[in-house]
């Protein structure tokens, strides 16, 4: 049930703004009272330029005649999450924050498992469960790949099914899907679609152990069965990138990146229709649980259930299956990508040094240990449009990265640069070991379609020397750089705030999109 959702409806922008204060050049704090029932403050990591985007959205909201439909501005959503039962320390927004379903995209919130009332919310994970990014390195250089980038882009386009409704070429029976949902990358390894090292360089080692396929509906499985090893549409892509700058040579070398001009491949995809259906199914069950348990929220999109409830446990088990599916999906596309490169360059993938640098999730909820008010607690950390960024010496990151901190992969927009960051101790203390995940929308998909022409977007990419293959050209306006914030501003804000550290900058030379 909702409560107090419109209690602040009559406030002017100046009245709203009085609750939001800058406490440093990279952080705003949203005080309790901004929305009803806040248990903790909101914290928004933005520099001066990005701050204006957040506040402009709030100003536009205050100037509207009526608030019906659509999403609340991100700052409201951050505050509404701060009112959820069991939330600790703060509801945190990263610099790429923008409004989404329930939680803002770019929101991190943690809930105390020692609190019987603490909740889990599908809106805090999102519909594309374990949407994430994987980076492969190679021993190839731009000088070698540049002359064949058009042919290589076409080869990737031919090997990896892309676009809305795309069907996979990885043979998957219903029994195999059940196994993949339970086993994650262990299934990929068993079936020959992954290398053992791939698993070591994946968040959670590519498998959430609490997965229970019996908690995934038949409809979700039906949607997921034909989509294994497919890229999908929207902001998903496979991109051939060049190392453009190295900021931390020690960390980069640990990742196998040792020179400017080195070729890498970035794959951005998630759990496709299966994950979307898991989220949809859970929302209905949680609305009933809220009525039964008397859980009150400020926004009905924040449907949730107690972590300890049957509905909460069922969602977490199904979400884990969708997360495992996404890791299998990215592993399958890695297999297809390695095939495409091997065919183009006449060498097996291992001779091309096509190793996984790391694979990170952007939409997930996980049980983690964090210090809160001087006490170690087990928390259910929701990351929606944000990335885990654990520091050096953390036990949950691979041996290879114990001295550097976890690699964090930040995808840019179509045609702009991407980054590799590393996790820090300050991030562990301040943001539950989390940082940004990308550029973050500055313009809605609908508005992008109305103000941009797809021919212009494609022409700009070509003038930058970027080979592009797109399954749905008329949708590329939604993903144009003009539709997003500046990813460099986002990354620099996180670096300046100390919650992650810049390591490598990558620029695209070929893009494959749905």
Curated annotation (Swiss-Prot):
Pfam families per UniProt: RtcB
Class of the enzyme per the UniProt entry, highest EC level: ligase
Catalytic-site annotation from UniProt: 437 (gmp-histidine intermediate)
Keyword Manganese applies: yes
Cofactor binding note: Binds 2 manganese ions per subunit.
GO terms for MF: GTP binding; metal ion binding; RNA ligase (ATP) activity; RNA ligase (GTP) activity
Residues involved in Mn(2+) 1 binding: 128, 131, 236
Binding site residues for GMP: 235-239, 362-363, 411-414, 418, 437-440, 513
Key words, A-Z: GTP-binding, Ligase, Manganese, Metal-binding, Nucleotide-binding, tRNA processing
Cofactor(s) for this UniProt protein: Mn(2+)
EC number annotated for this UniProt entry: 6.5.1.8
Catalysed reactions, semicolon-separated: a 3'-end 3'-phospho-ribonucleotide-RNA + a 5'-end dephospho-ribonucleoside-RNA + GTP = a ribonucleotidyl-ribonucleotide-RNA + GMP + diphosphate; a 3'-end 2',3'-cyclophospho-ribonucleotide-RNA + a 5'-end dephospho-ribonucleoside-RNA + GTP + H2O = a ribonucleotidyl-ribonucleotide-RNA + GMP + diphosphate + H(+)
Annotated positions binding Mn(2+) 2: 131, 268, 362
GO CC entries: nucleus; tRNA-splicing ligase complex
Alphabetical list of InterPro entries matching this protein: RtcB, RtcB-like_sf, RtcB_euk
Domain of life according to the entry: Eukaryota
GO BP annotations listed: tRNA splicing, via endonucleolytic cleavage and ligation
Miscellaneous comment: Ligation probably proceeds through 3 nucleotidyl transfer steps, with 2',3'-cyclic phosphate termini being hydrolyzed to 3'-P termini in a step that precedes 3'-P activation with GMP. In the first nucleotidyl transfer step, RTCB reacts with GTP to form a covalent RTCB-histidine-GMP intermediate with release of PPi; in the second step, the GMP moiety is transferred to the RNA 3'-P; in the third step, the 5'-OH from the opposite RNA strand attacks the activated 3'-P to form a 3',5'-phosphodiester bond and release GMP.
Quaternary structure annotation from Swiss-Prot or TrEMBL: Catalytic component of the tRNA-splicing ligase complex.
Role played: Catalytic subunit of the tRNA-splicing ligase complex that acts by directly joining spliced tRNA halves to mature-sized tRNAs by incorporating the precursor-derived splice junction phosphate into the mature tRNA as a canonical 3',5'-phosphodiester. May act as an RNA ligase with broad substrate specificity, and may function toward other RNAs.
Family statement drawn from the similarity comment of this UniProt entry: Belongs to the RtcB family.
Name of the protein in its database record: RNA-splicing ligase RtcB homolog
């Amino acid at each position: 049930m909702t409560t107090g959702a419109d209690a602040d409806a009559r406030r002017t922008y100046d009245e709203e703004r009085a609750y939001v204060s800058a406490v440093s050049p990279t952080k705003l704090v949203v005080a309790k009272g901004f929305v009803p029932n806040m248990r903790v403050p909101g914290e928004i990591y933005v520099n001066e330029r990005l701050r204006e985007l957040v506040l402009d959205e709030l100003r536009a909201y205050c100037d509207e005649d009526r608030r019906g439909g659509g999403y609340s501005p991100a700052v409201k959503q951050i505050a509404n999450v701060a009112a959820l039962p069991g939330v600790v320390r703060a509801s945190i927004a990263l610099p790429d924050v923008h409004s989404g379903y329930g939680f803002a995209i770019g929101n991190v919130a943690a809930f105390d498992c020692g609190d019987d009332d603490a909740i889990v919310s599908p809106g805090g994970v999102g519909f594309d469960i374990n949407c994430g990014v994987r980076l492969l390195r190679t021993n190839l250089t731009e000088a070698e790949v540049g002359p064949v980038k058009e042919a290589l882009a076409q080869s990737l386009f031919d090997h990896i099914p892309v676009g809305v409704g795309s069907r996979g070429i990885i043979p998957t029976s219903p029994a195999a899907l059940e196994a993949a949902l339970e086993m994650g990358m262990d299934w990929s390894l068993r079936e020959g679609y992954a290398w053992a090292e791939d698993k070591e360089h994946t968040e959670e080692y590519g498998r959430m152990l609490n997965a229970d396929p019996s908690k995934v509906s038949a409809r979700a499985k039906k949607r997921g069965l034909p989509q294994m090893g497919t890229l999908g549409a929207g902001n998903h892509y496979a991109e051939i990138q060049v190392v453009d700058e190295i900021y931390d040579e020690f960390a980069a070398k640990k990742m196998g990146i040792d020179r400017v001009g080195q070729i890498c491949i970035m794959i951005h995809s998630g759990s496709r229709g299966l994950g979307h259906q898991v989220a949809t199914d859970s929302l209905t069950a949680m609305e009933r649980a809220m009525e039964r348990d008397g859980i009150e929220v400020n926004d009905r999109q924040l449907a949730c259930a107690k972590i300890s409830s049957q509905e909460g446990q069922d969602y977490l088990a199904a979400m884990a299956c969708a997360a495992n599916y996404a890791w299998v999906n990215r592993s399958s596309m890695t297999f297809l990508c390695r095939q495409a490169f091997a065919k183009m360059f006449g060498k097996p993938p291992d001779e091309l040094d096509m190793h996984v640098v790391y694979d990170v999730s952007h939409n997930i909820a996980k049980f983690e240990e964090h210090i809160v008010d001087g006490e170690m607690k087990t928390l259910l950390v929701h990351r929606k449009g944000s990335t885990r960024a654990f520091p050096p010496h953390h036990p949950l990151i691979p041996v290879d990265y114990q001295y550097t901190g976890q690699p964090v992969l930040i995808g840019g927009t179509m045609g702009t640069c991407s980054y590799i960051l590393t996790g820090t101790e300050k991030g562990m203390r301040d943001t539950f070991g989390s940082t940004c995940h990308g550029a973050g929308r500055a313009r809605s998909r609908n508005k992008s379609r109305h103000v941009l022409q797809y021919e212009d977007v494609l022409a700009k990419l070509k003038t930058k020397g970027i080979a592009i293959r797109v399954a749905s050209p008329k949708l590329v306006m939604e993903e144009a750089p003009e539709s997003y914030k500046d990813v460099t501003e986002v990354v620099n804000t996180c670096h300046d705030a100390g919650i992650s550290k810049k390591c490598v900058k990558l620029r695209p030379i070929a893009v494959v999109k749905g």
